[in-house]
């Protein structure tokens, strides 16, 4: 990628993240991103069709490597990895998760349903097999989202291994 294009995209992305933390997604306008990134409107739209497209790229960046190539990992290792990734990207994750952004939550929930639920169900929910699967999926996914939300709001940080233990104990 051309360095000028990469620099422009970084400026737009950084402005988006700053505004996400300052204003929240719902109160942010494309014009706010343009002003903070110090780019022209046509430049913004040359790279992104909308603020939704920018959010989509952010979600892709956050989730892409999380669940790819981890099929063989055990549940605890996978969860610790995810929590570490969320801590590393706390500025992005916290803003989106705590704002309850619908797109972000849908993307996160889809990834969790596909990649986390089967492992958790296999290892920790054997005694709950007589319950409807869609209820179990909903329970695991919402418990995960709420656990991460709680964790991101804590003043005294809990390490990822301890958080993994808390999450698994909630499910057992």
Regions inferred by a protein language model and the residue ranges of each:
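Amphipathic alpha-helical segments enriched in hydrophobic/aromatic and basic residues
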Residues: 20, 29-30, 44, 51-59
